[in-house]
């Protein structure tokens, strides 16, 4: 927790438009020199890491920034001096001694403000009481107050269970987040698990609709338009800064360019002279390249002009001359732009086809496939992209060199459009700035079993045919024009060590992988067919990943045995021969024979498991397939491997030893792939025909297993065999990949060969009689006599010469059948395509032409390039003219490509998610709509679905496994406002919608229990409905609690992610001291030990981040993060919840920050609230019964002392005293004389009364003081409940507000009259108690004893006189026994009973009868029939039966608390009843007058005339008697009231039955309510 202080620079109150300091700090508007003069208010709130740093960071006068604590040491225990950089560092917290540095030097005029030796500022030591420090946590840590409090704020905010959050915080569980790996950071897309936690989130039964988009089979990853070409003298050149890639549309419109390296036809083989002897430093280029003049720095000045030359060996010797002189010249060479110019010239796209003869040869200069050359000092890099787009039979090789002087910091940004990069979060530094720890590419490797069949790695399959079509390394491709196929662009990337210039420019291939050698490469994509086979045909290690494996489609007519043979009987033919005597004999020969004594051996390799390799740079079809098939587990494993691969940097050679076998999946992949890349990454693969492709497929995996075993040849000679070889045996030998042992390259000059091997990275395979492929020198060599498939492996003579056994013959026979069916063995097909290729080879022109030549067919080419078919549904708004791309002009096409470019190559995208139609924060106002959409989007993809093309290049999403507080911080960061509308408001709106739905459902179920439950007999249904109601109510309460937590974040600048700490503040040293004791010991504050624990464990996590265990889901990293979390928890609140407390050596729990703050001994209650201050006093409280509610009695002695300054000022003002001293003497000598002036001073000034402990707001209240005698404070008894005080010796403190603002605030906010209700519950807190309650009860109760006595003494309650045959029976003899009364009444009378009532009543005759129902409220009034004669209404004597009379008497005996004197009953005997003691009063003044005259008692029943409202205890009462006269006047008699009405039933008089005590009580209440002062307060 922190305080956000609001200041104002003036003495006036802050205006509304003044921004809060928190907002200013967030905007960076508050400077360090701002003087904040006055504190108006402060607010407790969350603090951001930036604000916590601002508390602690400060800049010394010498410009040094201090505040960070990284050392866990405190003081030197011998000298007790603070350690530098530790928890008591004088540089951070200030000097121990005033104006002395840690060196012991005192500040003088000559000394600067900061000691130059120790760096301590010369300031006062008081700064150690308020200067703070901070700890930068390596891993985020959750604040324990918001995690383990009740309720848990984070749990309510994220709508997750508290136990799950705790398990995630302490790294015992993982959280899977769907992320996007794109450019330089991970962007979170989906919080599906949060939505699933809501019971209304998912609804079943929703079907996914099929989507139709524009589908194109020729959709490539990169787009090229001629507008991106610039005209040059030598042709068209690509502008790298505008667009890094291009796409070739049709080979018919392509102009073939002359190659760079070519030798004249005469084939001179002389040894070329050395460049050093000539003394020339020139680059030699192809004849078709223009001269480029570049200048760079060197020892002797600038380099000379680059001249045009013909021979490439001269160019190489020039480079070798620079590199062989000295390392400094080598650095100058690469520091200059000469090599950059060389690359730029060769960055054009060369497509040449020429006839190769025996004298022509190619030099594979810079022969590594694709290299990334980077130097630490010069900041220059060369990057080569290898891109293939396969066409019919011959492929067009597209190369692009990306050259740019690069800063190391922008390295990832440069490569970000090409590859999906991964960089860590800011709080988890995985990599340094060095190149070896930067992930440039995304490596997709095979699964654990390295028996990986390159059949899937090197070829793809046709849509319907189902046969092997081509390898990515092959230039031979056979297909029919009607068939569609899938293609892709493989890319290779090899980063080298940054210090390569110190010894060698490019790393040479070695037998062992040195620690400094870091080589990676992107392997080609796997290409698939759209047709599947059954799952039982392919085995996989992971049974759950079968759906993501590609399947090879065979013809339906093939037998299962053929399929099995095809998968199992894969062969690799191993050539084994002796080394030749002279390497010159083997130099650049096209063909060579195998002598008869040559023996060829082969190895049988069984492969029954198929795996895939994946590259993120793929075309549309491949992305569509993989996005639908690849599951999250493989994606996650690939991402884990990628991070570990680049993090470790291949620094340990023994880790990748070839003999080591490890069960670890990641280590196994790294070791295998490293061996594969080191063995074959720079190889030049070539295939002349389909059979050679097959041999390469079979050879490649076995070569991986052999690793560094190399081929060797027996002795060969430059004989006529090379010129006149035409036999099939020679043709077979000419189609093999021959690998020279020890990876040697041979040149005409031995010296040049050695220099070349040291200068460049050597190529391992010399490709003879085939197509040549290098990184940027492209040669498509066509042999003189094309070979057919039948002349190779399917020829009987070939099989005989290869000495194939029965099994091998069967294999080739089975393989021959499907190939023959496809028509691939026809010589005519091969001859036709080769003839076309030869014709194109001679069509070389010097003048370059654009890629798209035909302007008329431009629109058609454009439509073919981007769109395959357009499906238009019925009712669609699309018009036919919009779908016809022939109507598009060039401007429209250019605009489309520009938009597409922006889509594919976004440099700085926002939050990316896979659900492109919803909001970025994945929050919907309506939960039901979101649930339906989520169910629709997360449904299993159908094979008829297609992806949106514009979003294909945005990267691949992964399910990343996270744990610890960092994952919680990522979830909380989703509530960070991203646009105009904050995410908190969206969530609050969603919760409000959920509450409306819950309220509606709860109301429906409650109505069910009110009305419908009576018609249902099934108890089980009722229980289910009841349980559903309970669940809905619990959900509603949870939603309300969550909404209550969300509301404080709305409209404020506080972010929920600040509940996770990344910066930890350190208290000033004075608050956690180290005190030396007498016995040569020291007492250390517990906080220092807790801070030390945090620092130690923070360093542990930092060490793991810098080491191999950089992934937060490794076991070691999890444990380290858990320890750090527990250490911070113990520092904030030790032992909270179920966490184990950190104890001292004596098992005593250490005191944490919370222990120092809370409790009676805490900082607030002990040091602040209990501190003695001026203008305060303390005394015992006693009751003041005559005080008003807002008054308190203040002793005179205390009042004179408290108000003395105001009293002295008033005495001087009234000239009673002349000065301050005389006034004090007057007060001391004659205090009674100044009491009147003191009352004037106290008249409008309140005092604050406080009783400890102050547990809530009402613990301090304001009162009007009243001078009293004595030494105790008088307090109104009703306010004791707010203070929790009683009058048994409690003490209260008195405080005097000084300013007028304080007095006004005391009256308005703290006055006792304004605090009648409890702020916690809203219930009244000032209630009558003790003697007040007793007095009110005595006034309003009935005296049961006196009433009982009157029953025996008078006829007050039963005032009737009974006469029976001259005998009078007194009621007192039977009043105590109900049975006696019953028996007495039920006696049969011998004569009529005479009834006498009040004088205003009439006699009742038997002549007229009336019916009366006493049990209902409806009274039947009998009208008088005889109006002439005044008659009374009589009741029939035998009206009630004996049973009814008995019931009435039983009610009479039960209701003893009611007045019984008016209960009507019918007596069977003739008797007269009269009463003279009932008292009637017209107002309560008469009642009080009779009470004072003692005419009536306090509890005597009386009848009071009343014309206002009144209340009864009973809700319904029946009339006891109704009396009517002949004029229609009526009297309604009730036990509690009497109503007199006229003939029109208008109420004339109304009497209520009460007592004088109740009259007195009500009179006091009415007078109090009608006071003017009380009316004003209301």
Curated annotation (Swiss-Prot):
Q: How is the cofactor bound?
A: Binds 1 Mg(2+) ion per subunit. Binds 1 Zn(2+) ion per subunit.
The top EC class, named as a word, is: transferase
The cross-references to Pfam families, in alphabetical order and at most eight, read: RNA_pol_Rpb1_1, RNA_pol_Rpb1_2, RNA_pol_Rpb1_3
Reactions catalysed according to its record: RNA(n) + a ribonucleoside 5'-triphosphate = RNA(n+1) + diphosphate
An annotated Gene Ontology molecular function: zinc ion binding
Instruction: Write the record's keywords in alphabetical order, separated by commas.
Output: Chloroplast, DNA-directed RNA polymerase, Magnesium, Metal-binding, Nucleotidyltransferase, Plastid, Transcription, Transferase, Zinc
InterPro entries of this UniProt entry? DNA-dir_RpoC_beta_prime, RNA_pol_asu, RNA_pol_N, RNA_pol_Rpb1_1, RNA_pol_Rpb1_3, RNA_pol_Rpb1_3_sf, RNA_pol_Rpb1_clamp_domain, RNApol_RpoC1
The entry marks the following residues as binding Mg(2+), namely: 1286, 1288, 1290
Describe the task this protein carries out.
Answer: DNA-dependent RNA polymerase catalyzes the transcription of DNA into RNA using the four ribonucleoside triphosphates as substrates.
- HAMAP family attached here? RNApol_bact_RpoC1
Output this protein's name. DNA-directed RNA polymerase subunit beta'
The organism of origin for this protein: Tupiella akineta
The gene that this protein is the product of is rpoC1
